[in-house]
């Protein structure tokens, strides 16, 4: 029997799959649940639900009690929004969980990070490794908040006492991915154009590969370290999105716009939304374009050497599984 762990974000895309995989490997799994619907969801996945919130340190202390490991998967992810909300959820919420976990004598704290924490402006980034510094951009509140959160997590490492590790995937995909429904709607409405023809190289990470890396980080990760992980074989933006759309029987778009033009359009849309207090998200933002509009691939050599990481699901296998479900 493996250790007892706490999972945050257990009702979400990655969290629910992580719960299923951990249970199949013999873990005792608790899952933080901030609502009754979340309680039902994580219980349905097989975990023991614990009511609490990242805003409530007392509830986190109860949730982490007698746990050996914390998997911090929860995050506030949007491509547009109030920076204060990203700060509250992704930075202060993580600080609260770190405090509770350390106080409960948790041995390992593994955070699901984001490859985007090293993204700068629009320049291509190929074969990126962990030597690159964290980046913060005012127009990218999600990745900036994840960068601050990661720095805090790794800074909390105490060798042999409270060891912290961060796993950094690029775009996570797989069955029930929450962004695919929105992508289908946008394509059906004729609102999606490729940027620079969709030819930009990109790394991706199937949800099972991410969960595998999170578990390996507990067993083999060095405290105070971050690890890039991916599917191993890179693709282009057009190949990735076309493959996902085709699992729903949707033909990909054919039109394209240059990145330089799209960047100006995104700036204009952000200005309109900000000045006129428009509701919802702009159709295009600079953060969105940075995530998908320029080449970005990862060197996963460190994870391979130190964690023994190998992708467990290939791109083709993952697409076939999505097609079948």
Residue ranges and their predicted role:
Residues 216-282, 300, 316-321:
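Mid/C-terminal beta-alpha module of Rossmann-like enzyme folds, strongest
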Residues 298-306, 310-325:
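Amphipathic terminal alpha-helices
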